[in-house]
């Protein structure tokens, strides 16, 4: 299972990063792939109740990659963390295959409550740079979260959300091809910028 997940992670990197040249280079140099591999080892030890060892491994991964993933987080194969520095994934988070996470993104909790307090990210979601997804809700399949957005409630499938707090600016047809390329991310970031400018104009008018 470990090696299957690793292969899926490498395939996800090749599919989503135009700078990726070959599998060997990705395996050797991509911090996101390294962080996910470390995490799966930590997750194994966490499941068999060796929690201190799991935390030590996760902290080593954080030191070497700049990506912090709690050893209890559930992450499927085929996830791509691009650039990765500053990414944080909390204890009860779940991330499904096809998800792309950019640098500085946080899958965090709210408050000090126990139990499910981090988000569930369904398949083929894009979480842009600096976005914060906070709480124990679900981000639906194929959703896009704009750069710097702060998401505090459930996101429907195929929705694009931007702003602080995040709001829906578009819901795509489920039959549309999900665009997780860099061009697609730029379009999402542009929507985020436009929404921010609109908010500033509204505040000035008030």
Language-model region placement:
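Terminal amphipathic alpha-helical/low-complexity segments used for targeting or macromolecular assembly
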Residues: 1-65, 176-206
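C-terminal segments of enzyme domains that contribute to small-molecule binding surfaces
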Residues: 115-134, 138, 164-206
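Generic, ordered loop/turn and secondary-structure boundary motif
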Residues: 29, 34-37, 70, 108, ...
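Left-handed beta-helix
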Residues: 65, 70-71, 76-77, 82-91, ...
